[in-house]
């Protein structure tokens, strides 16, 4: 399973954009066989057209939010393997694995200039169920009251991955270390408690400068 892969050295439409401080540990050619490709949303630090084009396992099952399937089918992926999902849709991959897309407090936009493409495609987190175990892979998300309802519906969850970086946009956002669309470490733990997640791994930090907090601050 691979999630939101970006194998380029920077996030952006061309050669420019935030540069990675930490490069990918593998190249595309070094990837082991991938059977399931999950994409949470279309922001440049999560969806790379170059990675999609050059991905070596185009027979993999691909699960994406609504309106993002075209980026795969036009780049050589089989149409019957690319499935767009709405919130609360569940897809059975095989007898052992099923995947549900669940809501996130986020947004979508592909082009930098103008607002014409804002929220034209969906975004969402993934709940992966495998032989009685549940793994939550979060889309970028801010805190939201609906996570308590999701915890009642889907919990308990064995393992959760969630963002702990890109939370300081002060003074663009009035309150320092608070973001509507991302969580700081303390907010992530609260969110995961609402979801009834047993163990949590913080991600989405230390790779590139996407906001105003020091890049290595989140785990501190």
Placement of each model-derived feature along the sequence:
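Divalent metal-coordination and catalytic microenvironments
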Residues: 4, 41, 48, 99, ...
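Glycine/Thr-rich phosphate-binding loops of Rossmann-like dinucleotide-binding domains
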Residues: 11, 47, 72, 109, ...
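Pre-active-site segment of Zn-dependent metallo-hydrolases
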Residues: 2-42, 49-54, 108-118, 144-155
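Metallo-beta-lactamase
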Residues: 64-133, 220
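Active-site metal-binding loops of divalent metal-dependent hydrolases
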Residues: 5-7, 42, 68, 104-106, ...
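Short hydrophobic/aromatic-enriched beta-strand-loop microsegments
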Residues: 3, 61-63, 79-87, 158-163
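Cap/insert and terminal regions of metallo-dependent hydrolase folds
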Residues: 61, 67-70, 134, 142-220
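Residue-level marker for buried hydrophobic side chains located in beta-strands
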Residues: 1-3, 135-137
């Amino acid at each position: 399973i691979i999630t939101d892969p970006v194998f380029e050295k920077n996030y952006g439409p061309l050669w420019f954009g935030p540069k990675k401080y930490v490069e990918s540990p593998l190249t595309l050619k070094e990837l082991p066989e991938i059977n399931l490709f999950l994409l949470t949303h279309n922001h440049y630090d999560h969806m790379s057209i170059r990675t999609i084009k050059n991905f070596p396992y185009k027979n993999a099952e691909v699960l994406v939010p609504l309106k993002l399937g075209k980026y795969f089918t036009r780049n050589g992926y089989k149409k019957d393997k690319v499935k767009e999902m709405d919130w609360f849709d569940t897809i059975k991959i095989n007898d052992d694995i099923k995947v549900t897309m669940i809501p996130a407090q986020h947004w979508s936009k592909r082009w930098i200039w103008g607002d014409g493409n804002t929220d034209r495609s969906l975004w969402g987190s993934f709940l992966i169920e495998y032989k009685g175990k549940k793994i939550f892979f979060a889309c970028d998300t801010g805190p939201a009251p609906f996570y308590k309802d999701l915890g009642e519906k889907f919990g308990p969850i064995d393992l959760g991955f969630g963002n702990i970086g890109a939370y300081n946009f002060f003074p663009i956002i009035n309150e320092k270390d608070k973001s509507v669309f991302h969580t700081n470490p303390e907010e992530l733990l609260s969110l995961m408690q609402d979801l009834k997640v047993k163990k949590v791994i913080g991600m989405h930090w230390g790779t590139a400068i996407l906001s105003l907090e020091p890049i290595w601050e989140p785990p501190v």
